[in-house]
């Protein structure tokens, strides 16, 4: 654009040059001006997109869904006002993988926006959904979750970033729904991750692997041994096609604290309901406990008198290690 401006100024300066016919000069100026307009329009269309979802969520920090030019093929959910966050009040991170390995969180944006409104930085795999149209395009990859973590850490260290020194890079949750849950389990060994949240998902066994959709990551059950953090499975009960896989995972995990929360709503969960429905309530409690150390949120899960079992329809199972969580 600057080069075009220089050419334009040059053309105007020499508009009266007798060696160049006036008609030809006008044509040159017209061409340059048209090129400037096209370039300007292209620049405007390249501006990162953003969208306010459900008035910013119900949390104390009204959220925004947006693109970041520094992270292609990802969608960011974050508080609109970052000025309240600093070294003493940081944003824990949630990196998210989508159902069907879609390269857009179009099915989960209400759920993710709600989480962000409680003071979390959510980095979802895929293109921003500017409406409710389904995504049609190539599948996402497991690497995009790693890119999300890399980006969050880099932003926290970059003095030119609006997130500079505002991100809690020591508290990172990896999560995903269905195929996104498989992506999360594929990445579970990453030492930067401090908790896992596996939603409507679970690893396939050899005998039912034929039910998997082509392109899904298919780590073996032995992958569960690489989990090094507390993990929650949030499932849709027996109507959920991932119920057996998820519960089988849960029963195999005995080396780290693990729990399985079930609400019999099926594989689709409640993500599309206002503010993400019941699944967002449980997910938020887990993240507030695991990433923010919120003892009140821990009551949703801890003890025989946990609050989750008092919510209509929910059941909660915990392994032996779970009681050691503080």
Language model region names:
Residues 83-90, 134-182:
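Gly/Ser-rich "nucleophile elbow"/oxyanion-hole loop immediately N-terminal to the catalytic nucleophile
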Residues 88-99:
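Short beta-strand element of the alpha/beta-hydrolase
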Residues 101-107, 111, 129-147:
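Catalytic nucleophile-loop/oxyanion-hole region of alpha/beta-hydrolase
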Residues 181-190:
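Short glycine-enriched nucleophile-adjacent loop
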Residues 45-89:
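N-terminal cap/lid segment of alpha/beta-hydrolase-fold proteins
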Residues 256, 265-268, 273-326:
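Alpha/beta-hydrolase-fold serine-hydrolase catalytic core, especially in secreted/extracellular enzymes
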Residues 106-124:
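Short amphipathic alpha-helix adjacent to the substrate-entry channel of hydrolases
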Residues 194-273:
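The feature captures the conserved acid-bearing segment of alpha/beta-hydrolase catalytic domains
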